């Protein structure tokens, strides 16, 4: 019985380690020469790394969410909240700051990149 419990605990711990190391999940829903549509899922507490936007893009929030934005210029952290159905625009070449999901469940977005 002890061996079974220890095996279950070790398996659970390994699962948590694997899940913790996974970056935001991306699933390309549609792509052609003009556009790419991707569903992105952000796990609680997981940062999305900073980057430069390669294309103009529209982001549609599929879930209510709360996230921390780390300003790349000043290092200032701000909390932002979005509602399901909110839509935002970003220009090509913009600095995409580090974002961290502050909620207790994953949230999803649809990113429409114009090529």
Located regions from the model:
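A short glycine-rich, His/Asp/Glu-containing loop-to-beta-strand
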Residues: 24-49, 53-59, 112
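Ligand-binding loop in jelly-roll beta-barrel domains
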Residues: 92-115
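Short acidic-glycine-tyrosine-enriched beta hairpin
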Residues: 30-34, 74-93
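Histidine-centered metal-chelating micro-motifs
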Residues: 45-49, 84-99
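Short histidine-centered beta-strand/loop micro-motifs
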Residues: 40, 48-53, 70-71, 79-80, ...
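Glycine- and acidic-residue-biased ligand/ion/polar-headgroup-sensing regions
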Residues: 54-73
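Single-pass membrane-anchoring alpha-helices
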Residues: 2-20
